[in-house]
């Protein structure tokens, strides 16, 4: 008997077949660099920086920016941002810089140039006759890179959220050490003309390069990161959520995974912790792998590890976390089952802690405490099973465990308890639910059961 086949009759004829469905056609690519070569892009001929500044600023004022010219200018302007490397800097076996080296963002990557000239048109007229200062170059670089952050803000953010962000960014780049070079609201007007620029590979690459540089190098113009910070751990929302989750419940990654009671977690956990990646290495290329073009499809995104993502945010919802209530449910990854497990884990970690004395008046008190704890452990090991169950917790120190939670789920037939449902409804009904969010899912799914 083939376990994958089903048997049925059609017009009295027995049919045996294997039901097959559409599968994920994408192949997840891990970002580890194997050839010891720095990430690389190719741009047009390097421009005269003064001419390029005037052209790009003119285009910004007219809301008519040429992406190729902008990328060429951003790459050339890297020379203005020189800093000192604080420690030897290596990633995936590549030596980026030695301690004490003077480096620029260009030191992190390879930028090849062709002989193709840029347009460098003066779309908005010619206003600046003198050559720009370094502060003016820094302001223009900051405003241009901020177009990346604005284009990453989703339409789900309601009201004037994006406009307010743009206004705050403009204020940064008109305050020392920067200098005002555009009129108020220019950034938002320009953004509307290039709202999808985060999808342009070269622009994304340069945004990630600047961010990787300023995140490590102390610099007068480090505030440029305000526009590029979204490139850090981009398309890593699954891994980032898991990291936040284990800190929230105060467990190690290993301890937390023991609570993941579902077969669909197996592939996702394997995917998320693929060996050979620099997930835990500070200032690694890994942090900006998406923008630097090291992976076409991230294995760490919410879609790549959707069951893990759903579970984490159902636990977050149970604990009343606004970030989880606002997050978008991955509908294809068993949200109903994940909400059940999330209820039990939420109950396990909500309003309950593991505490012990860690600080003492003197060494004598510390030694007395340790001796008393040893005695308590010996009593627990010698327990003959007659100890009152309330005292059991006290003596064993084992107030929470994966086994206990799993047993509770099985005893309840894999269903949520009334108390879980009441908690879910309580936190979601008091929240302004966004479309397709966890708050909306919980409201629609459980409000009638409460």
From Swiss-Prot:
Location relative to the cell: Virion; Host cytoplasm
Coiled coil: none
InterPro entries membership: Rhabdo_ncapsid, Rhabdovirus_ncapsid_C, Rhabdovirus_ncapsid_N, Rhabdovirus_nucleoprotein-like
Family matches, as Gene3D superfamilies: Nucleoprotein, Rhabdovirus nucleocapsid protein like domain
Domain of life: Viruses
Keyword entries, A-Z: Capsid protein, Helical capsid protein, Host cytoplasm, Phosphoprotein, Ribonucleoprotein, RNA-binding, Superantigen, Viral nucleoprotein, Virion
Molecular function in Gene Ontology: RNA binding
Modification after translation (UniProt): Phosphorylated by host CK2. Unphosphorylated protein N seems to have a better affinity for leader viral promoter encapsidation. Phosphorylation of protein N in ribonucleocapsid may stabilize the interaction with protein P, thereby playing an important role in viral transcription/replication.
Main location: virion
GO cellular component: helical viral capsid; host cell cytoplasm; ribonucleoprotein complex; viral nucleocapsid
Residues with Phosphoserine modification: 389
Function: Encapsidates the genome in a ratio of one protein N per nine ribonucleotides, protecting it from nucleases. If expressed without protein P it binds non-specifically RNA and therefore can bind it's own mRNA. Interaction with protein P abolishes any non-specific RNA binding, and prevents phosphorylation. The soluble N-P complex encapsidates specifically the genomic RNA, with protein N protecting the genome like a pearl necklace. The encapsidated genomic RNA is termed the nucleocapsid (NC) and serves as template for viral transcription and replication.
Family classification: Belongs to the lyssavirus nucleocapsid protein family.
Assembly and interaction partners: Homomultimerizes to form the nucleocapsid. Binds to viral genomic RNA. In nucleocapsid, binds protein P and thereby positions the polymerase on the template. Protein P acts as a chaperone on free protein N to prevent it from aggregation before encapsidating genomic RNA.
Extra information: Displays a superantigen activity in human and mouse, activating mostly V-beta-8 subtypes of T-cell receptor.
Protein name as catalogued: Nucleoprotein
Gene name linked to the record: N
């Amino acid at each position: 008997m083939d376990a994958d086949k089903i048997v049925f009759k059609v017009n009295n004829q027995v049919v045996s077949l294997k039901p097959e469905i559409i599968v994920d056609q994408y192949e997840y690519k891990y970002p580890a660099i194997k050839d010891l070569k720095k990430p690389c892009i190719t741009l047009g001929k390097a421009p005269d920086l003064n001419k390029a500044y005037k052209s790009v600023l003119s285009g910004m004022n007219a809301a008519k920016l040429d992406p190729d010219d902008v990328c060429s200018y951003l790459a050339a302007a890297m020379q203005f941002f020189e800093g000192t490397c604080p420690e030897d800097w290596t990633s995936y076996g590549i030596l980026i810089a030695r301690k004490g080296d003077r480096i620029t963002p260009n030191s992190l990557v390879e930028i090849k140039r062709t002989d193709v000239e840029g347009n460098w048109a003066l779309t908005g007229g010619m206003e600046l006759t003198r050559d720009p200062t370094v502060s003016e170059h820094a302001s223009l670089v900051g405003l241009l890179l901020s177009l990346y952050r604005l284009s990453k803000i989703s339409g789900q953010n309601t009201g004037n959220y994006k406009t307010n962000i743009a206004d705050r960014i403009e204020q940064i780049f008109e305050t020392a050490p920067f200098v005002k070079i555009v009129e108020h609201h220019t950034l938002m007007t320009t953004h509307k003309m290039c709202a999808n620029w985060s999808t342009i590979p070269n622009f994304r690459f340069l945004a990630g390069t600047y961010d990787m540089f300023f995140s490590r190098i102390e610099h007068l113009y480090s505030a440029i990161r305000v526009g590029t910070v979204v490139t850090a751990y981009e398309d890593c929302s699954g891994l980032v959520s898991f990291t936040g989750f284990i800190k929230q419940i105060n467990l190690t990654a290993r301890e937390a995974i023991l609570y993941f009671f579902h077969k669909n977690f197996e592939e996702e956990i394997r995917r998320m912790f693929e060996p050979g990646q620099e997930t835990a290495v500070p200032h690694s290329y890994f942090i900006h792998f998406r923008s630097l073009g090291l992976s076409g499809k991230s294995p760490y995104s919410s879609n790549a590890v959707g069951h893990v993502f759903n579970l984490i945010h159902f636990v977050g919802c149970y604990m009343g976390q606004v970030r989880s209530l606002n997050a978008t449910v991955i509908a294809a990854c068993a949200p109903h089952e994940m909400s059940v497990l999330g209820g039990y884990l939420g109950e396990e970690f909500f309003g309950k802690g593991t505490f012990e004395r860690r600080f003492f008046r003197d060494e004598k008190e510390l030694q007395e405490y340790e001796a008393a704890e040893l005695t308590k452990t010996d009593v627990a090991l010698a327990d003959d099973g007659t100890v009152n169950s309330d005292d059991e917790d006290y003596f064993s120190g084992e107030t929470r465990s994966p086994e206990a939670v799993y047993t509770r789920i099985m005893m309840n037939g894999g269903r949520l308890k009334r108390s879980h449902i009441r908690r879910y409804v309580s936190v979601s009904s008091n929240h302004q639910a966004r479309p397709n969010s966890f708050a909306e899912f919980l409201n629609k799914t459980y409000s009638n059961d409460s």
